[in-house]
């Protein structure tokens, strides 16, 4: 799970926003050009690729339902840091957040030209080269992530020029590109963190540190009534005194996957029975988080590589359903 919105990035953007205080960026109709980003050249030359064989804390399946996870091949994974995988329901398009190195200061990520969201297409022989997803006007600063797609709408979180702090935005897929980005206008009192909206558009699941929870982050759900998200309800049956967040709900609404941090991040799953979420079960650990599933039930997620409490790299892994 990425941590891209640090105080330094917000400070930089707050300075940029001073001249535009009280304003917001109107939606674009003319998308910016999308030159091929040279993300590989931005990776530090001394970066060393970590493999399952050299991983100090290899991630394992905790059940017989899934095989042990394995990393996706290049070009999805590199010696840089890949995070926040989101698989489209067709099982063919994979969105991934990339930065050249987890050690790069966030204020440099903001302006490096390559940190951001990329899309890969699954082919018969592997994965396509990445397509950079541009969600800001040329020449304006933004640090985008947390991508979630439903239909032709993308929700993404962003710290960007013209705004104070982090906000949720939406963009529409039109004429082969993402454009028309605008503020998502969630009720600020809800404190919406990373989110997932059910396939029918009726429920918004998200994590938040808002009052009334059990841990630092708790899972919450809000109902959509006539286009308005209602007061969130705490998912008491799923939450713990640990960090619980980064929800993902399967297309049929029968499973809710989330990340629980118990020393290190772990992936947990709850099944819905008779309309209620059952006690969650640990599925993958350690350093496993932010799940997304394809139509076959295979799980894509982020695995971080640590040594002596220092994060060296991050990759996207997949666990195949048996």
Residue ranges and their predicted role:
Residues 1-4:
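Positively charged n-region of N-terminal signal peptides that target proteins for export
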Residues 19-21:
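Bacterial signal peptide processing site
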Residues 31-322:
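Short, conserved micro-motifs composed of acidic
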Residues 15-17:
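C-terminal motif of bacterial Sec signal peptides marking the signal peptidase cleavage site
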């Amino acid at each position: 799970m990425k941590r891209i919105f640090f105080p330094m990035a917000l400070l930089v953007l707050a300075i940029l926003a001073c001249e535009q205080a009280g304003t917001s960026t109107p939606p674009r109709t003319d998308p910016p050009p999308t030159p091929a980003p040279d993300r590989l050249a931005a990776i530090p030359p001394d970066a060393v690729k970590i493999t399952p064989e050299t991983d100090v804390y290899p991630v394992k399946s905790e059940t017989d339902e899934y095989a042990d996870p394995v990393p996706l091949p290049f070009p999805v994974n590199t010696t840089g840091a890949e995070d926040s995988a989101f698989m489209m329901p067709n099982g063919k398009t994979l969105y991934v957040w990339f930065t050249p190195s987890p050690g790069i200061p966030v204020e440099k990520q903001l302006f490096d030209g390559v940190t951001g969201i990329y899309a890969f297409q699954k082919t018969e022989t592997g994965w396509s080269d990445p397509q950079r997803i541009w969600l800001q006007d040329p020449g304006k600063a933004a640090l985008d992530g947390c991508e979630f797609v439903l239909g032709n709408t993308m929700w993404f979180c962003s710290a960007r020029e013209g705004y104070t702090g982090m906000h949720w935005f939406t963009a529409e897929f039109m004429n082969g590109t993402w454009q028309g980005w605008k503020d998502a206008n969630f009720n600020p009192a809800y404190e919406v963190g990373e989110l997932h909206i059910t396939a029918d558009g009726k429920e918004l699941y998200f994590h938040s540190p808002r009052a009334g929870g059990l841990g630092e982050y708790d899972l919450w759900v809000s109902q959509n009534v006539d286009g308005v998200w209602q007061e969130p309800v705490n998912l008491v049956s799923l939450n713990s005194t640990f960090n619980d967040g980064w929800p993902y709900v399967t297309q049929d609404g029968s499973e809710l996957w989330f990340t629980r941090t118990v020393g290190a991040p772990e992936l947990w799953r709850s099944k819905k029975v008779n309309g209620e979420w059952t006690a969650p079960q640990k599925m993958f650990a350690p350093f496993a988080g932010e799940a997304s599933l394809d139509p076959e039930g295979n799980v894509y997620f982020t695995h971080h590589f640590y040594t002596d409490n220092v994060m060296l790299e991050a990759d996207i892994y997949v666990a195949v359903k048996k």
